[in-house]
């Protein structure tokens, strides 16, 4: 009889522990997702529809990150671009997904990604293909 009670109590503790662990892990996942969304919200994603307004007609120097969601180097480069956006309010940083805006990729002759293009006064002033350090990226914009 005591063995049955101990087994039942053990099972109850195990189930309660698993429920608590599940809730904890679920909340941790939500925190990680919200941090990703928070940082991603700072950089505007530009499309063919709003490119002229947001980039060509901008009063600021614009840094364009041409990327694709499936591109590994683009994902690795993204935190560098985000850091430049956060630390340099005088630069407008935007992202263009080459899969969604193929016409812009063609217009700006983006053959490899990531490609970074700098626009000043509506005209391309500089470009680089591949990943760069934060300091090189800032230097490129100046």
Language-model-derived ranges and their functions:
Residues 1-41:
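N-terminal targeting signals for export/organelle localization
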Residues 5, 120-142:
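Non-catalytic, surface beta->alpha helical segment in thiol-disulfide oxidoreductase systems
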Residues 43-61, 102:
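A short beta-strand-turn-helix
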Residues 59-62, 66-70, 112:
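Short pre-active-site segment immediately N-terminal to redox-active cysteine/selenocysteine motifs
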Residues 63-64, 93, 116:
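Hydrophobic beta-strand anchors of alpha/beta hydrolase catalytic cores
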Residues 73-88:
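Typically the conserved alpha-helix immediately C-terminal to a functionally engaged Cys/Sec
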Residues 90-92, 114, 121:
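Structural signature of beta-strand start/N-cap positions in the alpha/beta core
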Residues 102, 108-117, 132-135:
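Structural micro-motif
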